[in-house]
Amino acid sequence: MRAERTSFLLALGLLMAGIRSVHCLPENVVVKDQRRRVDSHTLASSNTDFAFSLYKQLALKNPNKNVMFSPLSVSMALAFLSLGARGPTLTEILEGLKFNLTEIQETQIHQGFQHLLQALNRPSNQLQLSVGNAMFVQEELKLLDKFIEDARVLYSSEAFPTNFRDSEAARSLINDYVKNKTQGKIEELFKYLSPRTVLVLVNYIYFKAQWKTRFDPKHTEQAEFHVSKNKTVEVPMMTLDLETPYFRDKELGCMLVELTYSSNDSALFILPDEGKMQDLEAKLTPETLTRWRNSLQPRRIHELYLPKFSIKSNYELNDTLSQMGIKKIFTDADLSGITGTADLVVSQVVHGAALDVDEEGTEGAAATGIGIERTFLRIIVRVNRPFLIAVVLKDTQSIIFLGKVTNPSEA
């Protein structure tokens, strides 16, 4: 029976686009207390929990490599998919996204993402941020009107008729769409599409912001970055003198420096002590992030050395999500809320991400080095060994990018 089921792809870009949605509830769902709408903190907490869980899986599967992804893009795409899920398939997706279904209703989760999209799309002259979803649908496939409407209203999804029988043309159509929405940062989200594909869901996010205090390119010089005990590479190292939030975590053996964008969003650089990366990764939790944010205090850093980098990644997440408990969508899925029949199964979950950090700021579509030197009141921070980075939006506390930079010289 499984061999007869129809291919369905879930694509996760590293960008997002314009959202203008109005309040809408799924039919036949009564919210007992309308005031119990999911607030941004509740949504951010679940999304952060999911972000760190997914990070740990990706880091485990990609040892000694750069890791970069957009947890918000992945979670939003899966929440979008859950609109059409029923029964145990629905429960598995939402619990896999770290929602406690004894405390929160499905309707509230969708409302939470709806309001998050609205918040992310507020116009700003200090930040380029676009967020969106899209469906590419086999031309003769009949989707339920309710799914189409919920997708449009709650997730601002566009829909495009597509001829998947010409799989190469369909692949080009989708890849070009994502490339356009991500300002060229994600050039080839799909390497391959099966002719049996009938539906592709895409989520994309684009983020570009300038540092509040910019690095001077004239001071950027080649310097050593210690990838491991046995490997050192030369990278462009930026330097800056500034006052910025800083915290030395003696308990976890790491140092944190937060750099703020002109939009007041921020990038948090987490620098483990030598030999402490794996220990630190194991202890990444929402509670740890909250403690760090509460502990950051403005400090004068006379010399901050930070490598320029441009990292792109592409992940197939089927096995990773299965290990995180989201299994049924790939095997015996009940996605009857999409077409009215239970003949759809997700064949591939693909996520592409790109993040650039330079003297101007950040752009993303997705050994011996972290030394602190003190001479009286003079603080010098050298980021010249593997480190973690989290890009966080201030108003929603959403982690839009999370990753590990092991080798800045590798794209």
Curated annotation (Swiss-Prot):
Any one GO CC term of the record: chromaffin granule
Coiled-coil ranges per UniProt: none
Glycosylation sites: 100, 180, 230, 264, 318
Entry keyword Glycoprotein: yes
Subcellular location: Cytoplasmic vesicle, Secretory vesicle, Chromaffin granule; Secreted
InterPro entries: Serpin_CS, Serpin_dom, Serpin_fam, Serpin_sf, Serpin_sf_1, Serpin_sf_2
Positions bearing the site annotation: Reactive bond: 377-378
Cleavable signal peptide: 1-24
Superkingdom field: Eukaryota
Family in the record: Belongs to the serpin family.
Assembly with partners or alone: Homodimer.
Full protein name: Serpin A3-5
Organism name: Bos taurus (Bovine)
Taxonomic lineage: Eukaryota, Metazoa, Chordata, Craniata, Vertebrata
